[in-house]
Curated annotation (Swiss-Prot):
Binds as a heterodimer with protein bS6 to the central domain of the 16S rRNA, where it helps stabilize the platform of the 30S subunit. This is Small ribosomal subunit protein bS18. One of its GO terms (biological process) is translation. The keyword Ribosomal protein applies. GO terms for molecular function: small ribosomal subunit rRNA binding; structural constituent of ribosome. It comes from Erythrobacter litoralis (strain HTCC2594).
Length: 74
């Protein structure tokens, strides 16, 4: 008989009390939510809530537009 699958309870890293604010100028924080190729990692992998994922995507796109982050990494 196979082991039952237990889902790990995921909590949003931006919903905690001392959580960092999402800011387009904080490239080190934003790069943690991007793949090594420069793509935005989905929230089902990073455990970010839907609201914060939208804010995160907007901040990454804004940072890309003004040249702080690359669109694609070769």
């Amino acid at each position: 008989m196979a082991r039952p699958f237990f889902r790990r309870r995921k909590t949003c890293p931006f919903s905690a009390k001392n959580a960092p604010k999402i800011d387009y100028k904080d490239t080190r924080l934003l790069q943690g939510f991007m793949s090594e190729r420069g793509k935005i990692v989905p929230s089902r992998i990073t455990a970010v809530s839907a609201k914060k994922q939208r804010e995160l995507a907007k901040a990454i796109k804004r940072a890309r537009h003004i040249g702080l982050l690359p669109y694609i990494v070769k």
